[in-house]
Amino acid sequence: MNTVRVTFLLVFVLAVSLGQADKDENRMEMQEKTEQGKSYLDFAENLLLQKLEELEAKLLEEDSEESRNSRQKRCIGEGVPCDENDPRCCSGLICLKPTLHGIWYKSYYCYKK
């Protein structure tokens, strides 16, 4: 019976010591995996940040082009002479020949539509 106890004790000690070694190895593996995961997440985060910055630059560029092109160029106000062939009247105005007053000037003027 003594040999059974000694054998059992020996097996128990071996199991505990090997189990702790596995536990330490598992802990080390988990730390390595989390470090790799962090580096992967950092890489993915940087890649996403670059894509967002590129997209933002494109959007800002389009906005500046749009505002530059949509801005109304210098225009002629109401009651100001204009050229019949090249009217530059402001929006909401049209280049017409004057009625009654101003007919002696023989010129076109910008009037409201």
From Swiss-Prot:
Superkingdom classification of source: Eukaryota
Positions annotated as propeptide: 22-74
InterPro entries linked to this entry: Toxin_22 (IPR012627)
Main subcellular localisation: secreted
Gene Ontology MF, one: sodium channel inhibitor activity
Entry comment describing in which tissues the protein is expressed: Expressed by the venom gland.
Transmembrane feature ranges: none
Signal peptide limits: 1-21
SS bond list: C75-C90, C82-C95, C89-C110
Residue segments, region Disordered: 61-83
Keyword Signal found: yes
GO cellular component: extracellular region
Cellular location(s): Secreted
One Pfam entry name: Toxin_22
The entry's keywords: Disulfide bond, Ion channel impairing toxin, Knottin, Secreted, Signal, Toxin
Protein purpose: Probable ion channel inhibitor.
Notes concerning its domains: The presence of a 'disulfide through disulfide knot' structurally defines this protein as a knottin.
Family: Belongs to the neurotoxin 14 (magi-1) family. 01 (HNTX-16) subfamily.
The protein, known as: U11-theraphotoxin-Hhn1g
Species the sequence originates in: Cyriopagopus hainanus (Chinese bird spider)
